Design a protein with these regions (language model features):
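A membrane-pore/channel beta-structure motif
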Residues: 8-10, 21, 29
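Cleavable N-terminal export/targeting peptides
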Residues: 1-12
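Gram-negative (and chloroplast) outer-membrane scaffold detector with strong preference
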Residues: 28-123, 131, 167-171
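Primarily recognizes Gram-negative and organellar outer-membrane beta-barrels
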Residues: 12-16, 41-49, 82, 92-93, ...
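Short, surface-exposed charged micro-motifs
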Residues: 25
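Predominantly the C-terminal beta-signal and adjacent terminal strand-loop region
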Residues: 116-171
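Residues that define the transmembrane beta-barrel architecture of outer-membrane proteins
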Residues: 13-15, 20-22, 55-61, 99-105, ...
């Protein structure tokens, strides 16, 4: 049997993989209440169909820190901060594409249910701020839809309440 990592006992679960299908995270428990991790995701093209914006696609990766009020591997209230780098691609009704990239910061509060089979369900919500700048554009017409794409990204730069749901397995 391998020796425990960083002072853990043999029965402690230090790692967890969590997913919401389009978002995945791998975390390491620093102690009973604190965890750090890496997350990544890709949200496939989402139909917007508003103000000449047809679809929005996002991809991102970054780091997270979690604090559980009782413990990471038990039923507990929690706060998680996410810092990530990402990109967004907007497609307008004329087929033009506009690519944006930058960073984002989110703080989520919620509750985690931890089951005896090492499965956890995490539910929460919190604000999201992102700062993405236009990197490139592939214009198909002269109808000026780039302005509509910029306005859509501006609307998404601060979202006051973003839902958060993950299912995880600790090991």
């Amino acid at each position: 049997m391998a020796s425990p990592l960083f002072g853990q006992s043999d029965d402690e679960k230090r790692f967890a993989f969590r997913t919401a299908l389009v978002v995945n995270a791998l975390t390491y428990n620093l102690d009973k209440q604190n965890a750090v991790g890496f997350h990544f995701g890709q949200i496939p093209p989402t139909e917007i169909n508003k103000d000449n914006v047809e679809t929005l696609e996002k991809s991102f990766y970054g780091f997270n820190y979690a604090y559980a009020f009782d413990c990471i591997n038990c039923d507990s209230y929690f706060v998680v901060t996410f810092l990530n780098n990402g990109s967004s691609v907007i497609t307008t009704v004329d087929g033009s594409t506009y690519t944006y990239s930058g960073w984002g910061l989110s703080v989520v509060g919620g509750y985690s249910w931890y089951f005896e089979n090492d499965i956890s369900v995490i539910l929460g919500a919190g604000p999201l701020y992102s700062s993405e700048s236009k990197e490139s554009e592939n214009i198909k017409s002269d109808k000026g839809f780039g302005k509509d794409a910029d306005e859509r990204m501006e609307k998404l730069s601060f979202l006051p309440l973003v839902p958060f749901f993950l299912v995880g397995y600790s090991f």
